[in-house]
From Swiss-Prot:
Name of the protein: Vitamin D3 dihydroxylase
Species this protein is from: Streptomyces griseolus
Keyword entries, A-Z: Cytoplasm, Heme, Iron, Metal-binding, Monooxygenase, Oxidoreductase
CDD domains in UniProt: CYP105-like
Effect ascribed to mutating residue 88 to A: Decrease of the hydroxylase activity for both 25-hydroxyivitamin D3 and 1-alpha-hydroxyvitamin D3
Primary location class: cytoplasm
Length: 406
Protein backbone atom coordinates (compact mmCIF):
# COMPACT_ATOMS: atom_id res chain seq x y z
CA UNK A 1 0.00 0.00 0.00
CA UNK A 2 1.26 3.48 -0.91
CA UNK A 3 1.12 5.82 2.09
CA UNK A 4 1.01 9.37 0.75
CA UNK A 5 1.03 10.77 4.28
CA UNK A 6 4.69 9.77 4.66
CA UNK A 7 5.74 10.36 1.06
CA UNK A 8 3.72 13.40 -0.06
CA UNK A 9 6.11 14.13 -2.95
CA UNK A 10 7.79 11.58 -5.21
CA UNK A 11 10.77 12.34 -7.41
CA UNK A 12 9.50 10.40 -10.42
CA UNK A 13 6.05 12.01 -10.77
CA UNK A 14 5.84 13.31 -14.38
CA UNK A 15 4.47 16.73 -15.26
CA UNK A 16 0.74 16.82 -15.97
CA UNK A 17 -1.04 17.59 -18.24
CA UNK A 18 0.91 16.94 -21.44
CA UNK A 19 0.42 18.24 -24.97
CA UNK A 20 -0.63 16.03 -27.85
CA UNK A 21 1.67 15.80 -30.85
CA UNK A 22 -1.04 14.07 -32.89
CA UNK A 23 -4.69 15.23 -32.92
CA UNK A 24 -6.02 11.78 -32.15
CA UNK A 25 -3.32 9.99 -30.17
CA UNK A 26 -2.33 10.18 -26.52
CA UNK A 27 0.72 12.22 -25.57
CA UNK A 28 3.72 9.94 -25.08
CA UNK A 29 3.65 10.54 -21.33
CA UNK A 30 0.01 9.47 -21.09
CA UNK A 31 0.69 6.25 -22.97
CA UNK A 32 3.49 5.50 -20.52
CA UNK A 33 1.17 6.10 -17.56
CA UNK A 34 -1.44 3.79 -19.08
CA UNK A 35 1.08 1.04 -19.72
CA UNK A 36 2.52 1.23 -16.20
CA UNK A 37 0.90 -1.40 -13.93
CA UNK A 38 -1.72 -0.14 -11.52
CA UNK A 39 -4.72 2.20 -11.79
CA UNK A 40 -3.25 5.17 -9.90
CA UNK A 41 -0.08 7.17 -10.48
CA UNK A 42 1.38 10.34 -9.04
CA UNK A 43 1.87 13.37 -11.29
CA UNK A 44 3.20 16.88 -10.73
CA UNK A 45 0.95 19.85 -11.49
CA UNK A 46 2.01 23.28 -12.78
CA UNK A 47 2.35 24.71 -9.26
CA UNK A 48 4.60 21.89 -8.05
CA UNK A 49 1.91 20.06 -6.10
CA UNK A 50 1.29 16.40 -6.77
CA UNK A 51 -1.96 14.55 -7.41
CA UNK A 52 -3.17 11.11 -8.32
CA UNK A 53 -4.20 10.37 -11.90
CA UNK A 54 -6.55 7.47 -12.62
CA UNK A 55 -5.60 5.55 -15.76
CA UNK A 56 -7.71 2.37 -15.76
CA UNK A 57 -11.31 2.19 -16.95
CA UNK A 58 -12.76 0.18 -14.06
CA UNK A 59 -11.10 2.30 -11.38
CA UNK A 60 -12.16 5.47 -13.19
CA UNK A 61 -15.83 4.45 -13.18
CA UNK A 62 -15.71 3.47 -9.52
CA UNK A 63 -14.03 6.68 -8.42
CA UNK A 64 -16.26 8.94 -10.52
CA UNK A 65 -19.20 7.40 -8.67
CA UNK A 66 -17.58 7.57 -5.23
CA UNK A 67 -19.22 10.20 -2.96
CA UNK A 68 -15.94 10.54 -1.06
CA UNK A 69 -14.52 12.45 -4.03
CA UNK A 70 -15.65 16.08 -4.18
CA UNK A 71 -15.98 18.30 -7.26
CA UNK A 72 -15.66 21.46 -5.16
CA UNK A 73 -13.30 23.68 -7.15
CA UNK A 74 -13.02 26.19 -4.31
CA UNK A 75 -11.28 23.62 -2.10
CA UNK A 76 -7.63 24.61 -1.66
CA UNK A 77 -6.65 21.00 -2.36
CA UNK A 78 -8.53 20.74 -5.67
CA UNK A 79 -6.01 19.60 -8.34
CA UNK A 80 -5.81 22.66 -10.59
CA UNK A 81 -4.13 21.83 -13.90
CA UNK A 82 -3.62 25.41 -15.05
CA UNK A 83 -3.31 28.89 -13.47
CA UNK A 84 -6.72 29.78 -14.94
CA UNK A 85 -8.38 27.56 -12.32
CA UNK A 86 -7.61 30.28 -9.78
CA UNK A 87 -10.27 32.35 -11.55
CA UNK A 88 -12.75 29.53 -11.01
CA UNK A 89 -12.00 29.51 -7.29
CA UNK A 90 -12.80 33.21 -7.07
CA UNK A 91 -16.11 32.94 -8.94
CA UNK A 92 -19.59 31.66 -8.06
CA UNK A 93 -19.75 27.95 -8.82
CA UNK A 94 -21.80 26.32 -11.54
CA UNK A 95 -23.34 22.96 -10.65
CA UNK A 96 -20.37 21.15 -12.19
CA UNK A 97 -18.38 22.35 -9.17
CA UNK A 98 -20.96 21.39 -6.56
CA UNK A 99 -21.53 18.18 -4.63
CA UNK A 100 -24.84 16.51 -3.71
CA UNK A 101 -27.37 17.53 -2.65
CA UNK A 102 -26.78 21.08 -3.98
CA UNK A 103 -25.53 19.70 -7.29
CA UNK A 104 -28.71 17.72 -7.90
CA UNK A 105 -30.97 20.63 -6.99
CA UNK A 106 -29.28 22.93 -9.51
CA UNK A 107 -28.93 20.32 -12.24
CA UNK A 108 -32.60 19.33 -12.06
CA UNK A 109 -33.56 22.90 -12.95
CA UNK A 110 -32.03 22.41 -16.40
CA UNK A 111 -32.36 18.71 -17.15
CA UNK A 112 -35.75 18.87 -18.89
CA UNK A 113 -34.13 20.61 -21.86
CA UNK A 114 -31.60 17.80 -22.34
CA UNK A 115 -33.69 14.62 -22.09
CA UNK A 116 -33.49 12.02 -24.86
CA UNK A 117 -37.04 12.87 -25.97
CA UNK A 118 -36.39 16.63 -26.05
CA UNK A 119 -33.14 16.27 -27.98
CA UNK A 120 -34.64 13.76 -30.42
CA UNK A 121 -37.27 16.35 -31.24
CA UNK A 122 -34.54 18.86 -32.09
CA UNK A 123 -33.18 16.83 -35.02
CA UNK A 124 -34.99 18.82 -37.76
CA UNK A 125 -33.76 22.08 -36.22
CA UNK A 126 -30.19 20.82 -35.94
CA UNK A 127 -30.32 19.62 -39.56
CA UNK A 128 -31.54 23.06 -40.63
CA UNK A 129 -28.66 24.76 -38.82
CA UNK A 130 -26.04 22.34 -40.16
CA UNK A 131 -27.16 22.64 -43.76
CA UNK A 132 -27.51 26.41 -43.49
CA UNK A 133 -23.88 26.84 -42.52
CA UNK A 134 -22.81 24.25 -45.10
CA UNK A 135 -24.62 26.30 -47.76
CA UNK A 136 -22.58 29.35 -46.77
CA UNK A 137 -19.28 27.46 -46.61
CA UNK A 138 -19.76 25.78 -49.98
CA UNK A 139 -20.81 29.03 -51.62
CA UNK A 140 -17.59 30.67 -50.43
CA UNK A 141 -15.42 27.64 -51.36
CA UNK A 142 -13.61 25.58 -52.57
CA UNK A 143 -11.45 26.24 -49.51
CA UNK A 144 -12.47 27.07 -45.96
CA UNK A 145 -11.44 27.20 -42.34
CA UNK A 146 -13.73 24.47 -41.09
CA UNK A 147 -13.55 25.76 -37.51
CA UNK A 148 -14.69 29.35 -38.06
CA UNK A 149 -17.04 28.64 -40.98
CA UNK A 150 -18.74 25.47 -39.78
CA UNK A 151 -17.57 23.58 -36.68
CA UNK A 152 -17.90 26.56 -34.34
CA UNK A 153 -21.04 28.32 -35.66
CA UNK A 154 -23.17 25.16 -35.82
CA UNK A 155 -23.17 24.30 -32.08
CA UNK A 156 -23.14 28.01 -31.22
CA UNK A 157 -26.45 28.57 -32.99
CA UNK A 158 -27.95 25.35 -31.62
CA UNK A 159 -27.11 26.16 -28.00
CA UNK A 160 -28.25 29.77 -28.48
CA UNK A 161 -31.67 28.58 -29.58
CA UNK A 162 -31.90 26.12 -26.70
CA UNK A 163 -30.86 28.67 -24.08
CA UNK A 164 -32.55 31.72 -25.58
CA UNK A 165 -29.27 33.59 -26.07
CA UNK A 166 -29.27 35.85 -29.17
CA UNK A 167 -27.03 34.34 -31.86
CA UNK A 168 -26.36 37.88 -33.04
CA UNK A 169 -23.98 38.11 -30.07
CA UNK A 170 -22.00 35.01 -31.11
CA UNK A 171 -18.75 36.82 -31.90
CA UNK A 172 -18.65 38.24 -28.38
CA UNK A 173 -19.42 35.06 -26.46
CA UNK A 174 -17.26 32.87 -28.69
CA UNK A 175 -14.31 35.18 -28.11
CA UNK A 176 -14.90 35.42 -24.36
CA UNK A 177 -15.36 31.65 -24.07
CA UNK A 178 -12.16 31.01 -25.99
CA UNK A 179 -10.25 33.44 -23.78
CA UNK A 180 -11.62 31.75 -20.67
CA UNK A 181 -10.93 28.12 -21.57
CA UNK A 182 -7.57 28.82 -23.23
CA UNK A 183 -6.16 31.39 -20.80
CA UNK A 184 -2.69 30.67 -19.49
CA UNK A 185 -2.99 32.93 -16.44
CA UNK A 186 -5.59 33.57 -13.76
CA UNK A 187 -6.17 37.26 -14.49
CA UNK A 188 -6.95 36.72 -18.18
CA UNK A 189 -9.35 33.94 -17.26
CA UNK A 190 -11.04 36.08 -14.61
CA UNK A 191 -11.41 38.97 -17.06
CA UNK A 192 -13.01 36.69 -19.65
CA UNK A 193 -15.26 35.17 -17.02
CA UNK A 194 -16.38 38.60 -15.85
CA UNK A 195 -17.04 39.67 -19.45
CA UNK A 196 -19.36 36.71 -19.93
CA UNK A 197 -20.99 37.23 -16.54
CA UNK A 198 -21.70 40.87 -17.36
CA UNK A 199 -23.25 39.91 -20.68
CA UNK A 200 -25.48 37.24 -19.13
CA UNK A 201 -26.45 39.57 -16.27
CA UNK A 202 -27.69 42.06 -18.84
CA UNK A 203 -29.62 39.36 -20.65
CA UNK A 204 -31.27 38.29 -17.39
CA UNK A 205 -32.27 41.89 -16.69
CA UNK A 206 -33.80 42.09 -20.16
CA UNK A 207 -35.72 38.85 -19.62
CA UNK A 208 -37.11 40.17 -16.33
CA UNK A 209 -38.89 42.96 -18.20
CA UNK A 210 -39.36 41.26 -21.57
CA UNK A 211 -39.91 37.51 -21.09
CA UNK A 212 -37.38 35.55 -23.11
CA UNK A 213 -37.47 32.23 -24.87
CA UNK A 214 -35.35 29.20 -24.14
CA UNK A 215 -33.99 27.74 -20.94
CA UNK A 216 -32.54 30.97 -19.58
CA UNK A 217 -35.84 32.76 -20.08
CA UNK A 218 -37.66 29.95 -18.28
CA UNK A 219 -35.23 30.03 -15.35
CA UNK A 220 -35.67 33.79 -15.04
CA UNK A 221 -39.46 33.54 -15.09
CA UNK A 222 -39.68 30.59 -12.71
CA UNK A 223 -36.72 29.70 -10.48
CA UNK A 224 -35.25 33.21 -10.22
CA UNK A 225 -38.63 34.83 -9.69
CA UNK A 226 -39.64 32.45 -6.89
CA UNK A 227 -36.25 32.43 -5.19
CA UNK A 228 -35.20 28.85 -5.99
CA UNK A 229 -32.02 30.21 -7.56
CA UNK A 230 -30.26 33.52 -7.05
CA UNK A 231 -28.87 35.77 -9.75
CA UNK A 232 -25.23 34.67 -9.43
CA UNK A 233 -26.25 31.01 -9.51
CA UNK A 234 -28.28 31.61 -12.66
CA UNK A 235 -25.39 33.43 -14.31
CA UNK A 236 -22.95 30.61 -13.52
CA UNK A 237 -25.41 27.98 -14.76
CA UNK A 238 -26.08 29.81 -18.02
CA UNK A 239 -22.35 30.39 -18.53
CA UNK A 240 -21.54 26.71 -18.08
CA UNK A 241 -24.20 25.62 -20.56
CA UNK A 242 -23.27 28.29 -23.09
CA UNK A 243 -19.54 27.49 -23.04
CA UNK A 244 -19.86 23.72 -22.87
CA UNK A 245 -22.64 23.79 -25.44
CA UNK A 246 -20.48 25.17 -28.24
CA UNK A 247 -16.79 24.75 -27.34
CA UNK A 248 -16.84 20.99 -26.89
CA UNK A 249 -18.92 20.10 -29.96
CA UNK A 250 -16.87 22.47 -32.11
CA UNK A 251 -13.69 20.73 -30.98
CA UNK A 252 -15.18 17.26 -31.47
CA UNK A 253 -16.33 18.19 -34.97
CA UNK A 254 -12.90 19.43 -36.02
CA UNK A 255 -10.97 16.52 -34.54
CA UNK A 256 -13.49 14.00 -35.91
CA UNK A 257 -13.01 15.35 -39.43
CA UNK A 258 -9.23 15.26 -39.07
CA UNK A 259 -9.33 11.72 -37.71
CA UNK A 260 -11.66 10.32 -40.35
CA UNK A 261 -9.79 11.97 -43.22
CA UNK A 262 -6.56 10.51 -41.85
CA UNK A 263 -8.20 7.05 -41.71
CA UNK A 264 -9.55 6.80 -45.28
CA UNK A 265 -10.56 3.12 -45.06
CA UNK A 266 -12.66 3.81 -41.98
CA UNK A 267 -14.18 6.91 -43.59
CA UNK A 268 -15.01 4.99 -46.78
CA UNK A 269 -16.76 2.29 -44.74
CA UNK A 270 -18.78 4.96 -42.96
CA UNK A 271 -19.81 6.63 -46.22
CA UNK A 272 -20.86 3.26 -47.61
CA UNK A 273 -22.99 2.27 -44.60
CA UNK A 274 -24.67 5.14 -42.76
CA UNK A 275 -26.11 2.77 -40.17
CA UNK A 276 -22.59 2.84 -38.71
CA UNK A 277 -22.78 6.57 -37.92
CA UNK A 278 -24.14 6.34 -34.33
CA UNK A 279 -21.52 3.76 -33.41
CA UNK A 280 -18.82 5.77 -35.18
CA UNK A 281 -19.75 8.79 -33.08
CA UNK A 282 -19.28 6.73 -29.91
CA UNK A 283 -15.92 5.46 -31.14
CA UNK A 284 -14.79 8.99 -32.00
CA UNK A 285 -15.85 10.17 -28.56
CA UNK A 286 -13.82 7.35 -26.99
CA UNK A 287 -10.87 7.86 -29.28
CA UNK A 288 -10.58 11.64 -29.03
CA UNK A 289 -11.74 12.30 -25.43
CA UNK A 290 -11.34 16.05 -25.81
CA UNK A 291 -12.24 16.98 -22.20
CA UNK A 292 -9.53 14.83 -20.69
CA UNK A 293 -8.73 17.10 -17.74
CA UNK A 294 -12.35 17.55 -16.65
CA UNK A 295 -12.28 14.74 -14.09
CA UNK A 296 -10.62 16.64 -11.25
CA UNK A 297 -11.72 15.77 -7.71
CA UNK A 298 -10.49 16.11 -4.12
CA UNK A 299 -10.82 13.31 -1.57
CA UNK A 300 -12.92 14.07 1.51
CA UNK A 301 -11.98 10.77 3.18
CA UNK A 302 -9.37 8.06 2.79
CA UNK A 303 -10.04 5.79 -0.20
CA UNK A 304 -8.23 2.55 -0.94
CA UNK A 305 -7.94 1.53 -4.59
CA UNK A 306 -6.16 -1.71 -5.45
CA UNK A 307 -3.45 -1.29 -2.84
CA UNK A 308 -3.10 2.47 -3.16
CA UNK A 309 -4.34 4.82 -0.46
CA UNK A 310 -5.79 8.15 -1.50
CA UNK A 311 -5.63 10.30 1.62
CA UNK A 312 -8.34 12.79 2.55
CA UNK A 313 -7.38 16.14 1.07
CA UNK A 314 -5.47 14.72 -1.88
CA UNK A 315 -6.25 15.64 -5.46
CA UNK A 316 -7.43 13.03 -7.94
CA UNK A 317 -7.77 13.44 -11.71
CA UNK A 318 -9.65 10.88 -13.77
CA UNK A 319 -8.01 11.21 -17.20
CA UNK A 320 -10.68 9.91 -19.54
CA UNK A 321 -8.42 9.93 -22.60
CA UNK A 322 -6.19 7.38 -20.85
CA UNK A 323 -9.04 5.33 -19.36
CA UNK A 324 -10.64 5.19 -22.80
CA UNK A 325 -7.47 3.51 -24.12
CA UNK A 326 -7.50 0.73 -21.51
CA UNK A 327 -6.51 -2.44 -23.35
CA UNK A 328 -8.39 -4.64 -20.89
CA UNK A 329 -11.63 -3.01 -22.05
CA UNK A 330 -10.95 -2.15 -25.70
CA UNK A 331 -9.01 -4.43 -28.03
CA UNK A 332 -6.23 -2.55 -29.86
CA UNK A 333 -7.26 0.65 -28.02
CA UNK A 334 -5.01 3.03 -29.97
CA UNK A 335 -6.71 2.10 -33.25
CA UNK A 336 -9.83 3.80 -34.61
CA UNK A 337 -12.48 1.15 -35.26
CA UNK A 338 -15.92 2.43 -36.21
CA UNK A 339 -17.28 -1.12 -35.97
CA UNK A 340 -16.42 -1.61 -32.29
CA UNK A 341 -18.88 -1.23 -29.42
CA UNK A 342 -17.51 1.80 -27.56
CA UNK A 343 -20.66 2.76 -25.68
CA UNK A 344 -19.10 2.46 -22.23
CA UNK A 345 -16.44 5.09 -22.90
CA UNK A 346 -15.85 7.85 -20.35
CA UNK A 347 -15.74 10.84 -22.70
CA UNK A 348 -18.80 12.27 -20.95
CA UNK A 349 -17.62 11.25 -17.50
CA UNK A 350 -19.61 8.98 -15.21
CA UNK A 351 -21.80 9.25 -12.13
CA UNK A 352 -23.80 12.26 -10.96
CA UNK A 353 -21.58 14.67 -12.91
CA UNK A 354 -21.93 12.86 -16.23
CA UNK A 355 -22.24 15.43 -19.01
CA UNK A 356 -25.72 16.97 -19.10
CA UNK A 357 -25.49 17.74 -22.82
CA UNK A 358 -24.31 14.35 -24.05
CA UNK A 359 -27.53 13.60 -25.96
CA UNK A 360 -27.31 16.91 -27.79
CA UNK A 361 -23.63 16.36 -28.61
CA UNK A 362 -24.38 12.93 -30.08
CA UNK A 363 -27.21 14.32 -32.20
CA UNK A 364 -25.11 17.20 -33.51
CA UNK A 365 -22.19 14.95 -34.41
CA UNK A 366 -24.44 12.45 -36.20
CA UNK A 367 -26.10 15.17 -38.26
CA UNK A 368 -22.77 16.88 -39.00
CA UNK A 369 -21.04 13.72 -40.20
CA UNK A 370 -23.95 12.69 -42.41
CA UNK A 371 -24.18 16.17 -43.91
CA UNK A 372 -20.47 16.38 -44.67
CA UNK A 373 -20.48 12.95 -46.31
CA UNK A 374 -23.57 13.83 -48.37
CA UNK A 375 -22.59 17.30 -49.50
CA UNK A 376 -18.80 17.44 -49.42
CA UNK A 377 -17.73 13.96 -50.55
CA UNK A 378 -14.33 15.22 -51.75
CA UNK A 379 -13.51 17.02 -48.49
CA UNK A 380 -9.82 16.85 -47.62
CA UNK A 381 -7.30 18.63 -45.43
CA UNK A 382 -5.55 21.57 -47.08
CA UNK A 383 -2.38 21.00 -45.04
CA UNK A 384 -0.70 17.86 -43.71
CA UNK A 385 -1.93 16.68 -40.32
CA UNK A 386 1.56 17.29 -38.94
CA UNK A 387 1.27 21.02 -39.68
CA UNK A 388 -1.94 21.55 -37.72
CA UNK A 389 -1.49 23.61 -34.55
CA UNK A 390 -3.03 21.74 -31.63
CA UNK A 391 -4.35 23.26 -28.45
CA UNK A 392 -2.25 22.57 -25.35
CA UNK A 393 -3.12 19.85 -22.88
CA UNK A 394 -4.33 22.39 -20.32
CA UNK A 395 -7.59 23.01 -22.17
CA UNK A 396 -10.24 21.33 -24.32
CA UNK A 397 -8.39 19.37 -26.99
CA UNK A 398 -8.78 20.62 -30.54
CA UNK A 399 -7.57 23.09 -33.14
CA UNK A 400 -8.38 26.77 -33.52
CA UNK A 401 -8.05 26.60 -37.31
CA UNK A 402 -8.64 23.75 -39.76
CA UNK A 403 -7.88 24.53 -43.43
CA UNK A 404 -9.85 22.25 -45.75
CA UNK A 405 -10.60 22.05 -49.44
CA UNK A 406 -12.82 19.99 -51.74
Amino acid sequence: MTDTATTPQTTDAPAFPSNRSCPYQLPDGYAQLRDTPGPLHRVTLYDGRQAWVVTKHEAARKLLGDPRLSSNRTDDNFPATSPRFEAVRESPQAFIGLDPPEHGTRRRMTISEFTVKRIKGMRPEVEEVVHGFLDEMLAAGPTADLVSQFALPVPSMVICRLLGVPYADHEFFQDASKRLVQSTDAQSALTARNDLAGYLDGLITQFQTEPGAGLVGALVADQLANGEIDREELISTAMLLLIAGHETTASMTSLSVITLLDHPEQYAALRADRSLVPGAVEELLRYLAIADIAGGRVATADIEVEGHLIRAGEGVIVVNSIANRDGTVYEDPDALDIHRSARHHLAFGFGVHQCLGQNLARLELEVILNALMDRVPTLRLAVPVEQLVLRPGTTIQGVNELPVTW
